[in-house]
Each structure stands twice: as C-alpha cells, then as structure tokens.
C-alpha cells in the first residue's frame, strides 16, 4: 500500500466548520429574500391590475389576492431578517473579536489602491480597498501618510496643427524614490 501524501498549504475546513455560522434548521437568508422579491413583484402586478379593474374590493378578487401577495412578501422579508440574525448568534466569538483576515471589525487602516492598464488615450482604472498592511497591498500606490490623496492626471493627448497629425503624450510611470 503506498504511503499517504501530505498536501502542502492551508488545511481545508470540514463542511461542519464552514457552516458553523448558520443554524442548521433555518433556511438561507438569500432564499427568503429571493422569495420575498418574487412575491413582492407578483403582488404589485396583481394589485395594480385589480386596482384598475374596479374599485369595489368585495367584487374584485385581484385586489384581494394582490394585497395578500404583498403581505406574503413582507413575511418573507421578515423571515430573511430573522434567519440572518439567528445565524450570527451561535458563533464562539463575535465578529469584532475576530482576528485580521477573519471578517473582524476595526481591522486597522485601509489603503485605497488604484491600478491602471497600459497608458492609452482611453484608459480604464480599477479601484480596490484593502488593508494597508496586507499581502494584497503593493505599497506603491500609497507611499505617503495620506493614502487617499490622488494626483491630477497628466494630459493624455495634445493636438498639434501640423501635417503629421496628433502627437500623443501618454502618462509616464514615476520612478520609485
């Protein structure tokens, strides 16, 4: 029999550990919210159809059914709130006491990182919020004490009235100090 191979890397938590945050008997809050949205949409549609049919509720079944669907949607949204609140209670420690990287509150300073694609006249920029002292933080985009200070961009194109056409002056990357 061949020896068992040890895997390199972090251990994968068991399914029971992953689902520890939710009570097993309650449905998913996302499911309750989705059902509530469907019932709300149906209730609004049926209520509007009934409201324009006639204004006597006893002879207008659409108005009664539409209002019942709206009450059902309110019940689903209430269940969504209950399921999401009850799922947080049985944890061993609170979210504020969790360590860094575990979803804890007040983890420290946050840096605003901006990454841009190749310098072209039509440029796109991605903005990412990450902790200032994380592995994802490059340190290049926030060298100073004010990580949220943004610099004004250099002009991307200058129009010269010559026969050659347009002269492009793309922004240059700064040399690291």
From Swiss-Prot:
Positions of the UniProt region annotated as Disordered = 1-20
Cell compartments where the protein resides: Membrane
Question: Which keywords, in A-to-Z order, does the entry hold?
Answer: Membrane, Transmembrane, Transmembrane helix
* SS bond list: none
Q: Which membrane topology describes this protein? A: Multi-pass membrane protein
Q: What are the GO cellular component annotations?
A: membrane
> Membrane-spanning regions, if any?
36-56, 62-82
Report if keyword Phosphoprotein is assigned: no
Name of this chain's protein: Transmembrane protein 275
What is the source species? Homo sapiens (Human)
């Amino acid at each position: 029999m061949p020896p068992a191979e040890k895997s390199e890397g972090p251990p994968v938590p068991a399914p029971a550990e992953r689902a520890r945050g939710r009570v097993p008997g309650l449905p998913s809050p996302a499911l309750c919210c989705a059902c509530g949205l469907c019932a709300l949409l149906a209730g609004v549609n049926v209520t509007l159809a009934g409201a324009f049919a006639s204004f006597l509720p006893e002879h207008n079944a659409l108005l009664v059914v539409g209002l019942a669907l709206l009450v059902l949607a309110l019940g689903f949204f209430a269940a969504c709130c209950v399921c999401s609140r009850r799922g947080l209670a049985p944890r061993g420690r609170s979210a504020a006491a969790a360590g860094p990287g575990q979803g804890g509150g007040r983890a420290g300073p946050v840096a605003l990182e901006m990454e841009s694609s190749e310098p072209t006249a039509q440029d796109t920029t991605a903005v990412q919020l990450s902790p200032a002292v994380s592995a994802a933080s490059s340190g290049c985009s926030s060298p100073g004490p004010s990580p949220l200070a943004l610099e004004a961009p250099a002009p991307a194109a200058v129009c010269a009235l010559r026969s050659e056409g347009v002269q492009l002056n793309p922004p240059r990357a700064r040399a690291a100090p």
